[in-house]
Amino acid sequence: MLQPKRTKFRKMHKGRNRGLAQGTDVSFGTFGLKAVGRGRLTARQIEAARRAMTRAVKRQGKIWIRVFPDKPITEKPLEVRMGKGKGNVEYWVALIQPGKVLYEMDGVPEEVAREAFKLAAAKLPIKTTFVTKTVM
């Protein structure tokens, strides 16, 4: 599972997920899976989509993960009264804005890449689209 090795602070404010995305172009591979919607991906969702893609391409080609879960999400235990401080870190998420390239792939035919990204998109809670590298 993806998570930071060490952080400056253990817990983080909730914050807001506004603004425009960084990393909107396919830069490493030939094909990419781009986010259309806004939301957050947990480390488990990122890993589940990666496994689905890897199985679909039968371990040929190369896959790049362009998102990293660096925001800790805390939860309080069940049946605990409010107050008494912030809860414990339960999982890590990556905040996603529209236009962000989530995954990239190279070394496979386009039909195989499309099918792999379709399987991966089914594991993710946000809308995505298939993109190819634009050659200038």
Swiss-Prot record:
Any one GO BP annotation for this protein: translation
UniProt keywords, alphabetically: Ribonucleoprotein, Ribosomal protein, RNA-binding, rRNA-binding, tRNA-binding
UniProt-listed Gene3D superfamilies: Ribosomal protein L10e/L16
Intrachain S-S bonds: none
Domain of life: Bacteria
Cellular component GO terms, alphabetical: cytosolic large ribosomal subunit
A GO term, aspect molecular function: tRNA binding
PANTHER family: 50S/60S RIBOSOMAL PROTEIN L16 (PTHR12220), LARGE RIBOSOMAL SUBUNIT PROTEIN UL16M (PTHR12220:SF13)
Function (record text): Binds 23S rRNA and is also seen to make contacts with the A and possibly P site tRNAs.
Quaternary structure annotation from Swiss-Prot or TrEMBL: Part of the 50S ribosomal subunit.
Protein name: Large ribosomal subunit protein uL16
Organism: Serratia proteamaculans (strain 568)
Gene: rplP
